[in-house]
Amino acid sequence: AVALPAGVGMESLPPDALSPSAAPPPVVVSVLSTPKLHQVLAEGGPRVGATTTVPAATPPSEPRALDGKRRGKPWWEELFNDDYLRTTGSVTEREIAAEATFIEESLGVAKGATVLDLACGTGRHAIELAARGYQVIGFDLSLAMLARASDDAQERHQKLNFVQGDMREMTFEDAFDGVYCWQTSFGFFEEEKNAAVVGNVHRALKKGGQFLLEVVNRDYVAHDVPSLVWFEGDGCICMDEVHLDFITSRLRVKRTMMMDDGRSKEIEYSVRVYSLHELGKLLNDAGFRVAEVSGRIQTPGVFFGGEAPSIIILAEKR
């Protein structure tokens, strides 16, 4: 899943709480052809298009935390739908294969092993791993994502199960040899619920099972916000206003979508972003032993602190 979504957590400090003498940082405005927030941040900026720094007197307005009562449902239930699929861009088969190889080698399980793709989204990794001989279950909350995943699996003549559910309520027990959660699909919830998800993963794994988690590195993205990111999707133009709440470490995004059929949509979402020591403690407290940390799939086992776009952490169930 790409993963991402919206406004849960504490509000940022109001603008009048800041020193009036402190000039705001320049706003980075990007024009790109890829839409995923995690790609923009984890790759150090847009891969395609032009990037310019505009000296701005006032940074973009801070996206507010979503009011769940006003909205009626949390942002992760609103974001991941058919319109979202229009913004996800394309990923090459070569990129999918490379990511699947990294996942496969990190988990280190035998062919035929049972593997859970947690927050599988459209299932591209699950389908690729199934084709390589693993028994894969894709788990996601979004029916729109799972429908696409099922269609793609049928096109590739792969048989695997996709399960609709909420990771906070996952009840698997000693069921999997390996679990992976990719593309910053973790951190949507409040602190206690995020910790509960890690506990659910621990319970779902067999003893000695491996958990591979990939999220954007807080220490990396902190240098690049606030920012405005424009990108083109399938029949839509999108703008993301991105801020980091430095108190709660939640990355807050206000996304505006303008469709070619004249519709426009606006949604706010936020994701808890972590530094390595925070993730390590979270995993250790849940009963895991951290085995390896990487910053990119191209450099397994190598992590360069704030210079690493991602935190890819492999942990073993104790």
Where would I find each of the regions flagged by the language model?
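A short acidic, Gly/Pro-enriched loop at the edge of an enzyme's catalytic core
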Residues: 171-178
